[in-house]
Amino acid sequence: TEFVTRLPDNAVARACIASLRANGLGTEGIVFGGKRMGLYFLESGAAFRNSNVVYDREGSSFATLRPGMIDWEKIFSDAGWFHWSGIAAALSQDGADACREALEIADRMGLTISCDLNFRKKLWNYGCSAAEVMQPLVQYSDVIFGAEPEYKEILGIQPVGFKAVDAKDTTFEANLPAFEDFGRRVVELVPRCQKAFLELRNSITSNHNLLAAILYSDNTLKHTGIYDIECEVDRVGAGDAFVGGMIYGLITYPDNDQKALEYALAASALKNTVYGDFNHVMVEEVESLMQGNTSGRVSR
């Protein structure tokens, strides 16, 4: 797995690259340029107080990325899957154009393409709406990930709503026909899309969340059960954990979409219990949670 980005050539960036390598990611696709890394600052919420993010990304190395700066043909020469995030298109028009460049080359070279819609309202500041920019780019996607509000902002699909209050809540299953219509609408708007994933979250408080997930593929809806996370540690990165788990699941269980979906949600649920952006859990831990091991006992 290769991580592709643009970073300044300085000690801070080198330390970040070392961290990526320590977590098993290839970094040969990283190019150097610009003068600073983008930052974000997180004010963690508690109880009824929401978390808040402040972005400091204007003028960063990635925000000033332009087409032609990355040798996509070289990067894709031995690749089979290209995953991209809507955040990459949110920072600037040049960044959106670089996304299109990558997608066109990945498409021409026959890669599977997946997209995390990743709508971040605070980042779209260059005069274009997310829908205006993202809708043409999403058309290249074989696999799409997102939450209901993101599908609404980018594709205009009205949310069904996930209001479960505990793991035994029956309203989720009662709404499955509506979620099936939701998935069908995604495929209508993005004909190339073979699999549309929807991660669902109901926040009771900042530290108490319920999670579930849905997959629409081949005119069929698949769904998980509900995870009730009452003592959340850090939800930042849980969506990325879901996407990473889903890609891993689709590759590892190519003939079992249900198992891949369960793996993705278990990975995301575990990330809610881990502090920081990275999901520092093992495959065995995810599989254990999939099998119903939720005791939290010490493993000796």
Description of each model-found segment:
Residues 56-59, 84-94, 119-124, 169-173:
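Flexible, glycine/proline-enriched loop segments at strand-loop-helix junctions
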Residues 109, 123-220:
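Conserved phosphate/ATP/ADP-binding segment of small-molecule kinases
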